[in-house]
Amino acid sequence: MKFIFMGTPEFSVPILERLNELGDVALVVSQEDKRKGRGKKFTKTPVKVKAEELGLEVFQPGDINSKEAIDKLREVQADIIVVVAYGQILTQEIIDLPEKYIVNVHASLLPYLRGAAPINRAIMEGHDKTGVSLMKVERGLDAGPVSSVREIEIGDMNAGELEDK
């Protein structure tokens, strides 16, 4: 089974590691490196750092929906694309690329807290629990059928502690 993995933050890294153990990760797609700190040095995304450690090819398009990016993804001829906190909305053209489907791992109990920063929003909104949802990607923001959910009690955990769960 040939995979494309799309992710950016630390939350995505354990899933990339596990996917790499299970199959052929042909391409890792992450957001562009950003300037950070006082020196404004370019800092690699956590997913890029891990992908390089694993010897995987990394692709960092500014716009995942550009012709060049879509052509690159098409070249891979992936069976499945796995998306974990990638950070850009995918067009139908990308959704239709893999042989089988695209799955998204989202850090909330969908349909609640769609979109960015769901862990932080769960805490700020005073939710008792949150979780992780596995869903098939369809057109729309975190839309598509949810196939699996894991609930986590928030308690007195902060966002970093919840991400680690």
Which stretches of residues belong to each language-model region?
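Structural motif corresponding to alpha-helix initiation and N-cap regions
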Residues: 13, 41-44, 66-70, 88, ...
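Residues at alpha-helix termini
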Residues: 21, 53, 75, 124-125
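Donor/substrate-binding cores of folate-linked one-carbon enzymes
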Residues: 80-165
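Residues that cap or flank secondary-structure elements
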Residues: 7, 38-39, 61, 111
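Internal alpha/beta domain cores that form substrate/cofactor-binding pockets in large enzymes
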Residues: 2-4, 26-29, 57-76, 81, ...
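N-terminal Rossmann-like dinucleotide-binding module
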Residues: 1-38
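N-terminal beta-loop-helix "entrance" segment that forms/cooperates
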Residues: 34-54
